[in-house]
Structure formats: structure tokens, C-alpha cells
């Protein structure tokens, strides 16, 4: 369906032959939003502490140091935390966002970002693996353009 490339449908009830970290992670949009709300609140959701605030800070801090970032996966001006790409510089990135913003996405194009400086998060739920490099930056551009 996406450029003529055959798609393999993942059957969530089948036990995989091999575990794959986040590979095959499935969620509803509402549960994903609640997870992002928890991260935005530094580990708290609905008045319940699920992660310590220092844990969230550690997870979303740059752990690459001076390793250069260059590419679609990790563009200039970014580092990498524990499970997230992290914005480290204001002017070096080709996409908008505040220093401290963190994000990640799935193989089929789903993506999210949390911008602590603006106290917000956004997510895009798509299933277009061959077009994710087009839609992800467009999504972030559109979100930040709407804030102006």
C-alpha cells in the first residue's frame, strides 16, 4: 500500500520467536498520550508517582557527550538519552524545538516529542514507513507554527 512495498501485519497475540526491545510495541493513541503526559509531568500521572523526577531527568539527558550527531535519526544539535533523542543546541537543528526537547518514533512512522520548556507534548500516529522521513519533520514544523 505504501509505494508498492508489501506490508507485513504484526499479529499481537502471537508470541515472537525472539524478543526485540521496543520492536513491535503496540499501543492505543490514548495510552500513548497518557505515557507522554507522565513523561511531561516528570514521572507523575493522575497524582500517582510512576517514575522519579531524577530518573526522568537522567533518561532525557544527553549521554553521548561530544559524539557528533549527523543524520535523519540524530540531526545536528542533538544527543541521545536513554531511549530518546535529545535536543542539545538551539540553532543547529533543521527542525524547531527548545533545548531539552526529547523525542523518538516507531518504524512505521509514529513519532512523539516532549518539549519541557513549553510544557507540552505532541504525537503523530501514522503507518507509513516509507514516508516517515517526510512526515516527521513536517509534523514538528506544523506544531511549532501553530504556537506562534
Predicted regions and their residues:
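Catalytic loop of the DD-peptidase/beta-lactamase superfamily, centered on the K-T-G motif
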Residues: 1-148
